[in-house]
């Protein structure tokens, strides 16, 4: 059994997924873009941001729909997780996972998936800023309810609101459907945005012309694709994206990986009373990792990423 013990090994798994996505999209005329922190890393570091450990892609909605419908990996190693088809899937966007790995997301009741690359659809939004704000506010409310449904932690200021939301007679699937119907706008406008996360703020919007074409960009020694208007997108969304953030804000999204076998993971799940959850983050930096390490009461037996044959 090969252990994933450092960030370099995790990145190797992720870039393997990215390579296969690039292969498939190139062969099938599907447009994709490096985005978010992945794009900042490509521009500023020609690879990962040094402390980053995830990969994000954008696809125009039509390309995204084609991708989740058609994507196949001839070797059977990778598969796409489609929010419309996966049972108990908590996200409103797709992920491509390496099926040889297991990643335990303890924040959401121990949900288990493989190491992944996130794929976000980019949708048309209203050209009117006031209307966009109204949609964003309604969408954020649905996301609050949805997060209360899936999370063990109360992220709201009011405990009463948290439990009221959690007890509403709606499923996560129903909420995902409501969010998609709200954000998917088929008629073209001059403005687009990633609408599938709790954000974006209005500054996350961009001119539709910015994603009408793509350009090559280097990432970890290989060439991939990003949107033609990537400089405007980065400036609008992140400000001075070439400037490094303060040291105390350089936190990874996934907590540093350790590994064990799938058998051990299943044993952990069955004997969860013997375990406690431990947050791995520097206090005071405002960072809330999406994945928490499930830690055994006995020191030295932590689990996050589990490779298996």
Residue ranges of predicted features:
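Intrinsic disorder/low-complexity segments
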Residues: 160-162, 252, 260, 284, ...
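Positively charged N-terminal leader segments that act as targeting/secretion signals
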Residues: 273-301, 307-309
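Conserved catalytic core of two-metal-ion nucleotidyltransferases
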Residues: 2-26, 68-127, 147, 151, ...
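A short secondary-structure junction signal
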Residues: 128-134
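Active-site nucleotide-donor binding segment shared across nucleotidyl transfer reactions
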Residues: 22-55, 59, 64, 209, ...
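Short, cationic low-complexity segments
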Residues: 138-154
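Generic secondary-structure boundary signal with a strong preference for alpha-helix termini
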Residues: 49, 53, 66, 232-233, ...
């Amino acid at each position: 059994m090969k252990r994933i013990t450092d960030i370099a090994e995790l990145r190797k798994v992720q870039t393997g997924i990215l390579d296969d996505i690039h292969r498939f999209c190139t062969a099938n005329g599907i447009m994709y873009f490096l985005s978010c922190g992945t794009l900042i890393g490509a521009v500023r570091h020609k690879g990962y941001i040094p402390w980053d450990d995830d990969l994000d892609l954008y696809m125009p909605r039509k390309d995204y729909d084609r991708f989740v419908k058609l994507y196949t990996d001839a070797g059977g190693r990778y598969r796409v997780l489609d929010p419309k088809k996966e049972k108990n899937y908590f996200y409103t966007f797709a992920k491509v996972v390496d099926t040889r790995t297991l990643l335990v997301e303890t924040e959401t009741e121990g949900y288990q998936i493989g190491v992944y690359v996130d794929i976000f659809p980019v949708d048309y939004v209203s050209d009117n800023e006031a209307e966009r704000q109204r949609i964003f506010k309604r969408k954020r409310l649905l996301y609050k309810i949805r997060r209360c449904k899936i999370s063990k932690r109360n992220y709201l200021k009011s405990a009463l609101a948290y439990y009221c939301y959690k007890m509403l007679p709606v499923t996560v699937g129903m909420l995902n459907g409501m969010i998609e119907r709200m954000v998917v706008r088929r008629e073209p406008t001059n403005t687009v945005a990633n609408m599938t996360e709790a954000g974006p703020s209005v500054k996350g919007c961009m001119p539709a012309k910015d994603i009408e074409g793509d350009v090559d960009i280097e990432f970890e020694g290989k060439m991939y694709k990003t949107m033609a208007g990537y400089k405007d997108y980065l400036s609008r969304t992140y400000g001075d994206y070439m400037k490094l953030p303060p040291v105390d804000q350089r936190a990874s999204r996934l907590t540093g990986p350790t590994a064990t076998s799938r058998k051990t993971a299943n044993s952990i799940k069955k004997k969860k009373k013997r375990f406690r959850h431990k947050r791995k983050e520097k206090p005071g930096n405002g960072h809330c990792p999406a994945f928490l390490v499930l830690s055994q009461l006995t020191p030295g037996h932590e689990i996050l990423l589990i490779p298996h044959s």
